């Protein structure tokens, strides 16, 4: 089999960016932006069903309000705002949204945009 060379280049570039930023700085950036996102979501009265001790800084789970259609809402975000969020999986399908803040997408301005759109559309 042939190795996917583009994957090797992507790994190299990802590791280069991580080295440039520093591991501790990257962890801190994820922590700060996750806290900002969670605070903003609770301020617009959305429920975060995962207990604080079990939360990940890279993924925030939000209970979907009953009046929101899951597919319609996620489609609106992606087509109107270029924001993609995940749906619930398994028993949580149609009940929660999953918002990822990982790597280069974990930026304060992205958190601001997500919160602004959620405030407007929910």
Outline where the language-model segments fall.
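Hydrophobic alpha-helical scaffolding
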Residues: 1-4, 63, 104
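Structural signature of PLP-dependent enzymes
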Residues: 1-35
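A generic structural signal for well-ordered coil/turn residues at beta-strand boundaries
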Residues: 5, 56, 79, 93-95
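Flexible, glycine/charged-enriched surface loops at secondary-structure junctions
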Residues: 22-29, 45-52, 88-89
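Conserved PLP-binding catalytic core of the aspartate aminotransferase-like
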Residues: 47-80
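A common structural junction motif
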Residues: 77-85, 119-122
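PLP-dependent enzyme catalytic core of the Aspartate aminotransferase-like
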Residues: 91, 95-122
């Amino acid at each position: 089999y042939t190795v996917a060379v583009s994957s090797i280049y992507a790994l190299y570039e990802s590791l280069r960016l991580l080295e440039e930023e520093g591991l501790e700085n990257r962890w801190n950036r994820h922590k700060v932006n996750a806290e900002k996102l969670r605070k903003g979501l609770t301020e617009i009265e959305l429920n975060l069903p995962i207990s604080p001790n079990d939360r990940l800084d890279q993924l925030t789970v939000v209970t979907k309000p009953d009046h929101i259609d899951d597919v319609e809402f996620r489609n609106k975000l992606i087509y109107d705002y270029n924001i993609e969020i995940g749906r619930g999986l398994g028993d949580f399908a149609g009940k929660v949204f999953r918002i990822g803040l990982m790597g280069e997408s974990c930026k304060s301005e992205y958190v601001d945009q997500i919160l602004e759109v959620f405030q407007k559309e929910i």
